[in-house]
Amino acid sequence: MKAPNLAKFRGRSPVLVDDIVSSGSTIRTALQILKVQKLGSPYCLAVHGLCTDRAARRIRDRTVSFLTTDTVANRDAGLVIAPLIAATLVAAAAKSSL
């Protein structure tokens, strides 16, 4: 993984967003790059948190906050989107049955 020179963002807190976090290796690599470039304390968000407790802990230890949606049950699932997905599926089913 490579990153451009982020010097103009030094001291600011970056927000990393990933669609799926499983082993956490991509996020951890990105966090290391941000640390080397002396950015502020990062926040991490993931749509689907499939990671093991160990992988999540390794991310949590390197960030201000690690947050995922509730599409997969996990300790970090703080963004509730299951009702939105359910409502969308019901609406789509009702529309297709007409």
Each model region followed by its residue ranges:
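PRPP-associated nucleotide enzymes
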Residues: 1-98
